[in-house]
Design a protein with these regions (language model features):
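A short, exposed loop/beta-hairpin motif centered on an aromatic-Gly-Thr core
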Residues: 45-64
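Short N-terminal "domain-start" leader segments
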Residues: 1-47, 69-73, 77-83
Length: 84
């Protein structure tokens, strides 16, 4: 797992996930072995792990454009968990 943003700069929000409170990140540009995408990570039991993948796989640059595009245009800027 790789991130385009430093872990300490990622914003997290506590949510109820199936009856358990966990910390889920704002949408971020991240990568797995399959490629780059916009997704979220969570903090659970002291570990950082993938939480969800919101887009298909693409280049790092394309994923950053999707993240920076306003939500009303199909991107993630303005997402409730995203930084204001």
């Amino acid at each position: 797992m790789e991130f385009a943003k430093k872990i300490e700069d990622i914003n997290f929000e506590k949510i109820n996930s199936y009856g358990e409170m966990i910390e889920v990140s704002e949408p971020i540009v991240m990568a797995s072995a399959a490629g780059w995408y916009v997704g979220a990570i969570c903090k659970e039991d002291g570990f950082i792990q993938p939480y969800d993948r919101y887009t298909e796989y693409m280049t790092k640059e394309q994923a950053q454009v999707v993240l920076d595009t306003p939500e009303e245009e199909g991107g993630f800027k303005g997402h409730p968990f995203a930084e204001a």
